[in-house]
Amino acid sequence: MEKLKEFRGIKEHLGVFREAVKDAERIGFAGVPGVCTPFAQLFAYAVRDKDNIFIPNTDFSKARKLEVTEYGVELGEISPGNVDVLVLLGGLSMPGIGSDIEDVKKLVEDALEEGGELMGLCYMDMFARAGWYELLDFDCVINADIDGYVLRG
């Protein structure tokens, strides 16, 4: 994979994602419940004009609609159905809490429409560190690094 663009900050992060999925109609975010759910909600809000679902781990049968409400984006009713973009969230590749790569491959096969795009959305190069670039045929990966500090008065 080759680096096409660099970005800085959450606004640009959401912007590059929005650009990457601009032609999509139905987007599936697959990730670890609790860890990845808020990221799916955040990125689904950035593309709230699309039909978005959250897939817990790799259990496609439990996919739930990501609905925009007065509180933001919330999990709605069960809403399985193929997607034209499948976004794998980085938590799936994390040791100890992630999913087996064979289960991820099955999800890709089951959930992604023919001709659809497989996207990775992660932090701190999780997919590279897990060796997933060699195991999955990503069309696009959006990675961000988090730097931070703590101040006290």
Swiss-Prot record:
InterPro entries according to UniProt: UCP004962 (IPR009183)
Gene3D superfamilies documented for this protein: 3.40.50.2300
Family: To M.jannaschii MJ1183.
Coiled coil: none
Species lineage: Archaea, Methanobacteriati, Methanobacteriota, Methanomada group, Methanobacteria
Protein's UniProt name: Uncharacterized protein MTH_862
Residue stretches spanning the membrane: none
